[in-house]
């Protein structure tokens, strides 16, 4: 039986051994899957973490947990927010952004998806193009022939079909990714859509600590650095209370 994992901050070999032995009393066997050098846990289902290197694990435990053998020093994301390829590559892995990273798959459970190519039409006019229940799209910059990405939303009182924006597509224009690739429109992809997701990820991590330290490679937490800009002021304030 595989159970959910437990995560223990600053786990020493003694703490790990205690957990292993305690589990055995109740018939469970724990495995030390990984040690993270740093981790930001947003909720029970979403986190971003960096595996500790194999060398550091060996020095700390005398062995290397399985995931750290294969991915030591690499980042891992659980949950959609940090798994988005553009977000993960931009903020964490620093891998090259590929065309596929600029594509979004959209689905609807009822009705169908439509592209409304109305950008060059008079206000109030529409050109609905049927897509289906699933499609892959790229956000397109204004003025480049993009369309509104819509879904069927029932009927009006007069029996006319109503449309609403597909989830996550509002405020942007779109084209099917296959068309973007074939027409070589990669330069027309609206990066603002993806940069917004990057900004939201940074904002989320910043709720729990210093983002620049979290993604940095120096391994020094900002609150322990000796050259904090306010250190001198704090020392001076402390001296004001010295017994003279």
Describe the residue ranges of each PLM region:
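Catalytic palm active-site di-aspartate
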Residues: 1-9
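C-terminal, non-catalytic extensions of nucleic-acid polymerases
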Residues: 13-244
């Amino acid at each position: 039986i595989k159970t959910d994992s437990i995560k223990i901050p600053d786990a020493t070999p003694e703490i790990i051994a205690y957990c292993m032995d305690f589990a055995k009393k109740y018939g469970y066997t724990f495995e030390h899957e990984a040690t993270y050098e740093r981790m930001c846990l947003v909720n029970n289902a979403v986190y971003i973490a960096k595996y500790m290197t194999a060398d550091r694990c060996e020095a700390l435990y005398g062995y290397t947990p399985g995931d750290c053998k294969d991915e030591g020093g690499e980042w891992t994301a659980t949950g959609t927010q940090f798994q988005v390829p553009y977000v993960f590559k931009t903020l964490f892995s620093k891998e090259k952004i590929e065309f596929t990273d600029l594509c979004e798959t959209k689905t609807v459970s009822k009705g169908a998806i439509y592209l409304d190519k109305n950008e060059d039409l008079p206000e109030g006019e529409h050109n609905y193009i049927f897509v289906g229940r699933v499609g892959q799209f790229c956000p397109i910059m204004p003025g480049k022939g993009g369309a509104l990405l819509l879904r069927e939303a029932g009927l009006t009182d007069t029996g006319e079909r109503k449309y609403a924006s597909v989830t996550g597509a509002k405020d942007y224009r779109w084209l099917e990714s296959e068309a973007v690739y074939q027409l070589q429109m990669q330069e027309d992809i609206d990066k603002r859509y993806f940069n917004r997701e990057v900004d939201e990820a940074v904002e989320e991590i910043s709720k729990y600590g210093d983002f620049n330290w979290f993604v940095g490679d120096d391994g020094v937490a900002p609150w322990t650095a000796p050259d904090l800009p306010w250190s001198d002021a704090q020392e001076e304030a402390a001296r004001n209370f010295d017994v003279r």
